[in-house]
Structures are given as C-alpha cells and as structure tokens.
C-alpha cells in the first residue's frame, strides 16, 4: 500500500455552447507493476502486476450546464492470473474465492451536471481521485486496482471551502437476501485562507462504513465503523518549480453495533512534510502514532489490528514513513500519458502484540518497503 500518484492534476478543456451533442471516446488506463515487500505478523506482502483499462464514450448532453453522460467498461487484469474471485468487491488485494470467472470486467456509467462554477454532481461511478484523503484514511492503490466507486458524489470548489461528499454502494440487498447491504459514505474537505505565496488550511475528513439493512425477512446484524480526522496545514509555492506542504492531523476511530474488531474507540496522530521539485519529484516524510486505530480504507501499516494474524493486536503503532516518486509526462503526447516510479519505506518502532489467546510478544524495530512503476494513459478522441 505504497505511495502512488495515480493521476496528475490536469487542465480541463473548457466546454462551449457549440459542444452540445459532442461525442468523445476516452481510453483511460494504466499498466503497472507494484511490489510490496512486507514481512512479519502485521501485514503480508504481495505483488500486483497487470493493467486496468476503462474505454468510455462521453456524450455532452448540455454544454451550458456541463451535463455529461459517460458509459463504458472497467477491466482489471493481473499477469499470470488464470481466474478471478467472483463474489467479492475488489480492493487493494482481493480475497481468494472458490467461485471464479475468467476475467474481471464491470460496467462503468457516470452522469454529471455542473450547477455553477463551484458545484458539481456525479451519479453512478465517482471521480477516482481519492477524495483528498490522507494515507491513513485512503490507500492510493484503491484508485488503481480497486473496483470503481459507485453511488453519488457532490463536489464544491469555492474560494475558502473545498468539499467532497460521497456514498459508495458496495453490496446491494435483495428481498430475503442472506447478505447484508454494505456501503461507504464520507465527507472530505478543507477550509482555506489564501495569501499571495502561501495557503493556510484546516483539513476535515469523515468516513463511515455501514453493514446491515432493513430487510424484514432476514435478520442482519448492524455494524457501523467510523474514521475521522482534523488538523492544520500550510502550503507554499516557491516560484514555478517548488512547493512544500506541512500538515498535522489527529485521527479517530469508533465502532458501533455488532463488534467485528476488539476496539471500540481509537486515535492517531499524523504530522507530515511533503515537497515537489520541478514538477517531477515528490518527496514526503511522516510519523504515525496510534492506539486502537483501524483504517477503513487507508494504509494498513497504521492499524493496531494485524491484517494477517487473526486476533493479534498491538498496544501502539508507531511508524516513520519516507516516500519518493518521480513522474514524467511526455510532451509529444500532451496530457495523454505519464510515467510514475515510486518507493516507500516504513520503519516500525518497537511495540507489544497481544494474541487471541492472551499471550504477548515484543516487536523491535523493523523496516518494510514498497516499490512500483505505472504508465498511466488517458487519450481522448472526438468522434462527432
């Protein structure tokens, strides 16, 4: 679950009145190789070699209000995979399932409308941008190899407030279904104070995962898990080739309902320094200190619950994270393709683990690392 900038911030082509009924073909995708070298009782390592492809047609229904309809397919493939789990939603690393299918292909459909210059609504597949969530709340691998988020999304981009509110429906419930409904909802934003050379901001994040439903024919246990974070940040742009971003966030975890993990409430603290050089290099350093914290969509290195050893918990999770990535966009194919190479080092500080049977084990310093490369492409062709 390393640092992987999936898609750069790109200028958006302006929509003009004459673009009504315009039809375009988009071919968004990425071919990637990710090697997560993780060892020990906390999290297992894994390798992700493959590609994701999203061919889509876009119809500009009303250029005045920027009303668009996009439809296509989402295709994920791992090199060497003979079959794919059929009964699970795909996250960063899907679980094995005895029921399989020869490929993993999903429909992709999105309708969007822009109410004004600041407010936009998405229905269907959501914007795959990570919702501006920090690493403990969102693993960037989800934007690459996870199933598309589906539901609704509202984005507000004002001068002093930026907000993303969404619901991602993961499991639909049928009448008399033995499977409960599952969805994730969240709100992520920041209050900003702009100056000529810097920006002071207050980041606010909230994520809830719900499992249950109102099917009266079948009894479902209801469980809600919450992540939240708030903090302070300072962003400064120095010239055209350098910026730095300093922030500190406090995190909160809470579980309500049928217990699925041994923690009811937990917390974490996460200071981070990030810089970008010449629009190529992104470097960051951070420190995490957490107790009884479980990341719902985030990087599992920050969890106090083991991902590979049932019932194992840690009294404290303290992690120093160093990240570096290099990006290259090719001017011969502007705004259509870029290469990313990255590496992440996680240094664990000593902690004590407690197993399900009550026995304890002391863990010393340990290093884990992840490296990867991705060639991201998103050409567009105007059909008529």
What does each model-identified segment do?
Residues 60-63, 99-120, 124-129, 157, ...:
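Subset of outer-membrane beta-barrel
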Residues 34-36, 80, 130-133, 213:
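Short acidic/His/Gly/Ser-rich catalytic and metal-binding motifs that mark active-site loops
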Residues 65-67, 119, 161, 281:
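Secondary-structure transition into beta-strands, especially the periplasmic turns and strand N-termini
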Residues 39-42, 85-97, 135-136, 302-308, ...:
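Flexible, solvent-exposed loop segments that connect beta-strands
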Residues 28-30, 50, 108, 160-166, ...:
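Exposed, low-structure sequence patches enriched in small/polar residues
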Residues 6-102, 107-113, 274, 368-374:
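Beta-barrel outer-membrane channel/assembly domains of diderm bacteria
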Residues 120-190:
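Surface-exposed coil loops of outer-membrane beta-barrel proteins
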């Amino acid at each position: 679950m390393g640092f992987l900038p999936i898609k750069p911030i790109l200028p958006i082509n302006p929509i003009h009145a004459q673009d009504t009924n315009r039809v375009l073909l988009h071919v968004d995708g990425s071919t990637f190789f990710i090697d997560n070298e993780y060892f020990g009782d906390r999290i297992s390592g894994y390798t992700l070699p493959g590609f994701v492809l999203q061919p889509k047609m876009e119809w500009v229904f009303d250029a005045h209000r920027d009303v668009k309809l996009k439809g296509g397919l989402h295709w994920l493939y791992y090199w060497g995979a003979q079959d794919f789990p059929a009964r699970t939603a795909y996250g960063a690393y899907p679980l094995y399932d005895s029921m399989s299918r020869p490929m993993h292909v999903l429909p992709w459909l999105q309708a969007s409308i822009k109410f004004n210059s600041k407010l936009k609504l998405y229905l269907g597949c959501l914007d795959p941008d990570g919702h501006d969530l920090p690493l403990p709340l969102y693993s960037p691998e989800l934007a690459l190899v996870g199933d598309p988020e589906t539901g609704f999304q509202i984005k507000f981009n004002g001068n002093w407030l930026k907000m993303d509110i969404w619901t991602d429906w993961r499991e639909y419930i049928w009448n008399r279904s033995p499977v409960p409904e599952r969805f994730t909802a969240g709100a992520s934003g920041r209050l900003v104070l702009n100056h000529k050379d810097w920006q002071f901001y207050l980041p606010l994040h909230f994520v809830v995962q719900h499992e249950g439903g109102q099917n009266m024919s079948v009894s479902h246990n209801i469980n809600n898990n919450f992540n939240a974070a708030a903090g302070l940040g300072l962003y400064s742009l120095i010239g055209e080739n350098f910026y730095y971003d300093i922030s500190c966030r406090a995190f909160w975890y809470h579980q309500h309902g049928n217990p699925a993990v041994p923690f009811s409430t937990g917390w974490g603290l996460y200071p981070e320094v990030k810089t970008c050089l010449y629009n190529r290099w992104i470097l960051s350093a951070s420190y995490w200190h957490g107790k009884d914290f479980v990341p719902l969509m985030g990087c599992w290195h920050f969890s106090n619950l083991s991902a590979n050893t049932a019932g194992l918990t840690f009294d404290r999770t303290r992690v120093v994270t160093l990240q570096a990535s290099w990006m290259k966009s090719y001017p011969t194919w502007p705004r259509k393709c870029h290469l990313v190479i990255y590496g992440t080092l996680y240094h664990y500080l000593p902690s004590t683990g407690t197993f399900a049977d009550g026995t304890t084990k002391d863990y010393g310093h340990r290093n884990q690392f992840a490296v990867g490369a991705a060639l991201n492409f998103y050409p567009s062709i105007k059909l008529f």
